[in-house]
């Protein structure tokens, strides 16, 4: 048999498999776009995300709220204009229909972030009268502005069906038209009544979309930004429900952004300004300030110019594959896809997915160094520091890429050895696809964090996977450090 014939047979087989394996539906998921027309970067990122979803033939695009930065009419309409430019007439480039599956978030319907508003609201508990008389904010006519921006009627809770799959779209409307909060501002008004009067397939997945986190799901029990818990109680009656939320801006690399219990919950990453987990020395997390010992020695990772993640769902007859992608790099994967089996069998739970995941490992011969420097802490204050530097632990055929790193300062005095400081740190481009995150990782200690009375100090570094399992350490040679002088010079 000739090579040409063999190739023809192979092509035919591949085509047959492709036809047999045609997915049931495809959906893109974005959140926290925070569109601001005066910032062209945000518009570009949204446009790029929609073009990526067009190229992948999305049947619909979910947007989990915070479409705008300040909740103004101009921002909301700019979002609609970009949608129409990419999907004119709600059509993909191949002519097929694509559905808008959007909801309002707090930035869209709570104009707290406009100049002068936050301080007034914090002091008086209400919005200023002048704000509520403005015609250029979404809050003052949510339905009218939604229709003007997106060419569709608005309802606080909307139901749409796309390719046979139901979507429940629950807008964050926890303020009345006078700017006053409802009795339970962390809950979607009317949600219990909606589910009581709507029925859903008991086996086929259906999707629920809101901005804030259904309590007790993604991010773990200490995650901030959760709702009151009533949503979770409703969805728990539907094991085939899959919820989407935004709000916390977490990266797509977070394994805790997929939760499965009585139902399934997925946290969408942010399209603008990615945030990390709390407590990392160079992390970017609004929760750090609330910690008893917040990170102090390093500036936050700056994800604003180059951090933009999205999800893409492909629905098959027995599973849903969730691609976690980086829009800055054209939709390249930033982490391995999630696979959610349906019906819900619990295999996507934290416990099931974390079990048996190997620890990352440094490459053979990897070395870590420590040196004294004059640096700046997170507040910008100049001071004496110790810089610990090491290469990233990259993936191999048997081990994953490191999620973050634990760095310990180990002090020795006479016969006593003790850990005097422990830090967690990210690689500089932890939110990019691995092949672009190759630079050295640094972790800074204030010189004052190391007790003066020591014979030697060693720094030990361990790579951790996303579930906190540590690989083998690399360590510096023992060294001594002169008596601490907190500020410049040494």
Located regions from the model:
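Short acidic, glycine-rich surface-loop motifs adjacent to enzyme active sites
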Residues: 195-219
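N-terminal active-site segment of His-dependent metallophosphoesterases
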Residues: 19-77
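A short C-terminal boundary segment appended to hydrolase-like catalytic domains
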Residues: 293-424, 470-474, 479-490
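Active-site-proximal beta-strand elements of phosphoester/diester hydrolases
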Residues: 24-37, 164-175, 207-209, 264-270, ...
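Signal that preferentially marks extracellular ectodomain short beta-strand elements
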Residues: 432-453
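Extended active-site neighborhood of metal-dependent phosphoesterases/phosphodiesterases
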Residues: 73-196, 230-240, 253-304, 308-314, ...
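Beta-strand-rich modules
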Residues: 448-469
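Solvent-exposed serine/threonine-rich low-complexity stretches and specific carbohydrate-binding patches
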Residues: 417-437
């Amino acid at each position: 048999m000739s090579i040409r014939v063999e190739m023809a047979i192979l092509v035919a087989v591949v085509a047959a498999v492709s036809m047999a394996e045609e997915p049931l539906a495809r959906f893109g998921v974005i959140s926290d776009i925070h569109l601001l027309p005066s910032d062209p970067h945000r518009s570009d990122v949204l446009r790029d995300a929609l073009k990526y979803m067009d190229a992948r033939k999305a049947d619909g695009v979910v947007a989990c709220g915070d479409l705008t930065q300040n909740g103004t009419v101009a921002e909301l309409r700019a979002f609609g204009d970009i949608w129409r430019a990419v999907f004119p007439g709600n059509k993909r480039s191949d002519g097929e229909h694509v559905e808008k599956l959007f909801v309002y978030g707090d930035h869209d319907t709570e104009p707290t972030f406009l100049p002068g508003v936050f301080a007034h609201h914090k002091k008086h508990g209400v919005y200023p009268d002048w704000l509520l008389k403005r015609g250029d904010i979404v809050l003052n006519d949510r339905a009218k502005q939604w229709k003007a921006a997106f060419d569709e009627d608005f309802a606080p809770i909307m139901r749409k069906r796309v390719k046979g799959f139901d979507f429940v779209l629950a807008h964050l409307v926890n303020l009345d038209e006078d700017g006053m909060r409802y009795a339970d501002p962390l809950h979607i008004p009317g949600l219990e009544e909606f589910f009581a009067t709507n029925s859903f397939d008991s086996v086929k997945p259906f999707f629920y979309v809101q901005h804030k986190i259904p309590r007790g799901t993604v991010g773990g029990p200490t995650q901030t930004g959760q709702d009151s818990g009533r949503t979770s109680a409703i969805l728990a009656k539907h094991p085939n429900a899959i919820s989407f939320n935004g709000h916390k801006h977490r990266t797509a690399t977070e394994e805790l952004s997929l939760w499965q219990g009585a139902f399934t919950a997925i946290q969408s990453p942010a399209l603008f300004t990615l945030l990390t987990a709390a407590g990392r020395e160079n992390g970017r997390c609004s929760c750090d300030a609330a910690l008893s010992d917040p990170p102090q020695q390093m500036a936050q990772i700056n994800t604003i110019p180059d951090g933009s993640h999205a999800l893409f769902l492909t629905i098959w007859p027995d599973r849903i594959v969730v691609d976690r992608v980086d829009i800055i790099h054209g939709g390249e994967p930033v982490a391995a896809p999630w696979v959610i089996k349906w019906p819900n069998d619990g295999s996507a739970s934290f416990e099931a997915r974390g079990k048996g995941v190997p620890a990352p490992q440094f490459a053979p011969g990897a070395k870590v160094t420590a040196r004294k420097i004059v640096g700046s802490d997170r507040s910008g204050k100049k001071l004496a520091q110790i810089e610990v530097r090491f290469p990233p632990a990259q993936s191999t055929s048997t081990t994953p890429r490191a999620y973050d790193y634990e760095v310990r300062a180990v002090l020795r005095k006479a016969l006593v050895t003790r850990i005097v400081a422990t830090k967690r740190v990210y690689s500089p481009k932890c939110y990019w696809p691995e092949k672009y995150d190759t630079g050295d990782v640094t972790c800074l200690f204030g010189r004052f964090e190391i007790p003066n009375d020591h014979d030697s100090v060693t720094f030990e570094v361990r790579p951790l996977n996303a579930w906190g399992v540590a690989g083998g350490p690399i360590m510096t040679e023992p060294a001594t450090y002169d008596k601490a002088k907190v500020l410049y010079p040494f």
